[in-house]
Amino acid sequence: MPRAGVAASAFKLRNIWHIHNLHRVRSQQTRLMSDSVEEFSSVFQHAKKVVVLTGAGISAESGIPTFRGEGGLWRDFDATELATPGAFAANPSLVWEFYHYRRTIVAGASPNAGHYAVAALQRRCRRLGKDFILLTQNIDGLHAKAGSTDVVELHGSLWETRCCHCKAVEANRNMPICPALDGKGAPDTVHEANIPSMQLPRCNKCNGLLRPRVIWFGECLERDVLRRTDDALQGCDLLLVVGTSAVVYLFWRNMMEVELHTDFVESLLQDDRLRSRIGLALREKSQYLLVAFRRFKFQGPSSVKLPTALGIGEDELAEMKET
């Protein structure tokens, strides 16, 4: 990957559209943002390569819990405690119960209008000859269920496993994934998770212990995912960010090597340490800021705001649900 890779691509974006309710945009930035559907439609018409990045917010309206913060715990844990290699090594039974519960929730969930709007946008882009790439931080598979294709799943998938021994990756939608997990994983049940290792999901090839094929805290993205993300952002001139505030995640690792040619949405940074480093970089290139950068912010539920902003009506959404 080129040294500036993902970072350079991201900073050359001319437009960022950000639907969110996760943070407050500072007053001076708010003045620079537009909620005009007409203006956004004009920008979309001129875009040649459209990239959509989605996060937990788009699936929350389908009833998918985030397991973060107060009220979002599974038993006495949040995801940062269970979604780690160390937690799996220490108690694979507990981690598999957690993921069995997540698979159960997702298996009973349906895509919402936000997912269908993204699928409709992909179809529209292809019809108009525009490049379209969908990147998602979600592991639920609801975009594919809504009709989106070639989805880049940044954090992996609940519906795939990887062998801890031979590293084989396989799709697995069995519910339960193994007999020992049947009836396990209830969020309000506090008991010792002690399913014997040999009764947990095992590899069909070598009988090694399986783990969910998801990216856990402390792990790097897979090499192929990084390559596809870099390819997606190369030449992208319209980035739509839906249901997440973590767009910086796409290019942070190379950020300090990049010559900034456009403004950066500082409010997307949640980490004070990162914010201070980016702030310094922005000030050093202040002559470039806010010159050719148009931003849009449509705040509210993505299932409502996304179809409206994209001009996707009820008939088109209904058609997507039927296909």
UniProtKB/Swiss-Prot annotation:
Cofactor note: Binds 1 zinc ion per subunit.
UniProt GO cellular component terms: cytosol; mitochondrion; nucleus
Highest taxon of source: Eukaryota
Family matches, as Pfam families: SIR2 (PF02146)
EC number: 2.3.1.-
Keyword annotations from UniProtKB, A to Z: Metal-binding, Mitochondrion, NAD, Transferase, Transit peptide, Zinc
Name this polypeptide is given: NAD-dependent protein deacylase
Function: NAD-dependent lysine demalonylase, desuccinylase and deglutarylase that specifically removes malonyl, succinyl and glutaryl groups on target proteins. Has weak NAD-dependent protein deacetylase activity; however this activity may not be physiologically relevant in vivo.
Domain notes: In contrast to class I sirtuins, class III sirtuins have only weak deacetylase activity. Difference in substrate specificity is probably due to a larger hydrophobic pocket with 2 residues (Tyr-99 and Arg-102) that bind to malonylated and succinylated substrates and define the specificity.
Cofactor: Zn(2+)
Domain Deacetylase sirtuin-type: 34-323
Family according to the record: Belongs to the sirtuin family. Class III subfamily.
Organism encoding this protein: Physcomitrium patens
Feature: transit peptide: 1-33
Positions with a binding annotation for substrate: 99, 102
Gene giving rise to this polypeptide: SRT1505
Localization per record: Mitochondrion
Catalytic residues (positions): 155
Gene3D superfamilies xref list: SIR2/SIRT2 'Small Domain, TPP-binding domain
Positions of NAD(+) binding: 55-74, 137-140, 243-245, 302
One Gene Ontology MF term: protein-malonyllysine demalonylase activity
